Amino acid sequence: MFQGETAITVDDKGRMAVPTAYRDLVTRVSGNRLVLTYNPFEAGCLWLYAEKEWERVRDDVMSKPNTQRVIRTLQQKLVGSSAVLELDANGRLSIPASHRNAVGIEKKAVLLGMGDKFELWSEQAHRALIQQTLSDGDLGDELLDLRL
């Protein structure tokens, strides 16, 4: 399980170091490979999955009939735009320029461990996310019994 927030620096070639605390786990569960894709729900954010979890997500998304526009868009953003990334010998991932540019990641980014995946945010989008507050009206009935 991935959890926690880490400030990340992205070099001129689009490489980012995976935090040391996660490297062994990524190697163990995914053989040094992660799958990168767009977060279809929030701008400024990419998702990184271990391959096995990605296969489950991909298969689930692609099992839906693409006769509805929302399903096609989800399939395009998640599966059609995905890229398999491999940790190099220095524990870095090369984030494709197309993905970095689409979400506004330049030199600074934020990596969030979100249980079964990572979220990679542009620094600006992450700051905006953190500054948002939730009100009781934002929580659905299924969340009202959460003890935080």
UniProtKB/Swiss-Prot annotation:
Q: Which GO terms describe its molecular function?
A: DNA-binding transcription factor activity; transcription cis-regulatory region binding
Main subcellular localisation? cytoplasm
* Annotated SpoVT-AbrB domain residues: 5-53, 82-125
* Stored Pfam families: MraZ
The alphabetical list of record keywords is: Cytoplasm, DNA-binding, Repeat, Transcription, Transcription regulation
- HAMAP family annotated for this entry? MraZ
Family stated for the protein in its record: Belongs to the MraZ family.
From the Swiss-Prot or TrEMBL record, give the protein name: Transcriptional regulator MraZ
What organism is this sequence from?
Answer: Xanthomonas oryzae pv. oryzae (strain KACC10331 / KXO85)
- Name the gene: mraZ
